[in-house]
Amino acid sequence: MPTTEADTTPASATLALAFDLLRRHSVTPNDAGCQALMIERLERLGFQVERLRIGEVDNFWATRGETGPLLVFAGHTDVVPTGPESDWQYPPFTPRIDADGMLCGRGAADMKGSLAAMVTAVETFIEAHPDHHGRLGFLITADEEGPAVHGTRAVVEHLREKGVAPDYCIVGEPSSSERLGDTLKNGRRGSLGGTLRVKGVQGHVAYPHLARNPVHEAAPALAALAEAQWDAGNAFFPATSFQISNLQAGTGASNVIPGQLEAVFNFRFSTEVTAEALKARTTEILDRFALDYTIDWTLNGEPFLTTEGALIDATVASVEDVLGYRPQLSTGGGTSDGRFIATLGAQVIELGPVNATIHKVDERIRAADLETLSRLYATIMQRLFT
């Protein structure tokens, strides 16, 4: 790993905060002090902060203002593991700007850069509009890259119990594809996971009449599931996808018929179908084959979609004003914490940096994009609240 110094001097308030966040070894579910940095800045602006330690996870909920629509900035301070640090061009928790103007470090894109831009955008907006209309909020967790049980999901339930209902939410996930702001995520597919266990009778391969092979019995059923059309999608979502991700059977010996097959699968589903309908149809297909089976289901998130409204209008117009081009609306990609916040009735979008290097060795984004992203967030607030 080279130790030659690149530019380690932040050129703006947004980059300075990003550097401070990137230095923290906040591998999920550890926050490593990132939230304290954000809270200190927000409290100076008059935010009321509620620290929420849920299980072993740090979260916080912060609000400013008493009346009017509530805009929430949402994100996560945790990052994925780096893998061998020797594979990185620079140490992953020593942020720097390289000779190409790229901000390098684990979390630069996903999503400490966005967090820094959110904080400085709010600082800029409040300085210019101290008596602004509406309310501002932050929902920040350190449990997004891991199980995502004690993070945003749990905080949302806490807010639901308190009767808090955000009107708008901007999630800072890296939504952009090739250049900043070219893509806005205005929805995400739902995710439904299942573990299918098909029971057979173990035996010797030379005596199949004394055994029952669950692989042979399950194969036609799995093929039927893979070939099924679950829906046709719609203008915003592709057709629902069924994928088998893991298949396990046998003892490892070549002369033993297995006694059980286990198949792990996942649906990524659109708003054209419900999780309950997918479960029912899966059961109906499997029952055709007279299998001895069980299924354990895990609903990771319902689909959500923001098709129109003040948030979409303000965001699209802000991208056009600041960047000079119109963003594309997309529901592609994996799940995000927006799926939990949408259940509170909020209009939800995702707007963040280019995602080309997320979860990769040498994660990086254009350093100049962070100051532009901060301007975008501030412009959205101006359009909504002035």
UniProtKB/Swiss-Prot annotation:
A Pfam family that this protein carries is M20_dimer
| Cofactor details (free text) | Binds 2 Zn(2+) or Co(2+) ions per subunit.
Q: Which cofactor does it need?
A: Zn(2+); Co(2+)
Q: Which PROSITE patterns match?
A: ARGE_DAPE_CPG2_2
Q: Which CDD domains match?
A: M20_DapE_proteobac
Which terms in the Gene Ontology molecular function aspect does this entry carry? acetylornithine deacetylase activity; cobalt ion binding; succinyl-diaminopimelate desuccinylase activity; zinc ion binding
**Residues where Zn(2+) 1 binds:** H76, D110, E173
Q: Where is the active site?
A: D78, E144 (proton acceptor)
Mark the transmembrane ranges. Answer: none
Kindly indicate whether the keyword Amino-acid biosynthesis belongs to this entry: yes
What does the protein in this record do?
Catalyzes the hydrolysis of N-succinyl-L,L-diaminopimelic acid (SDAP), forming succinate and LL-2,6-diaminopimelate (DAP), an intermediate involved in the bacterial biosynthesis of lysine and meso-diaminopimelic acid, an essential component of bacterial cell walls.
Q: What is this protein called?
A: Succinyl-diaminopimelate desuccinylase
Organism from which the protein derives: Chromohalobacter salexigens (strain ATCC BAA-138 / DSM 3043 / CIP 106854 / NCIMB 13768 / 1H11)
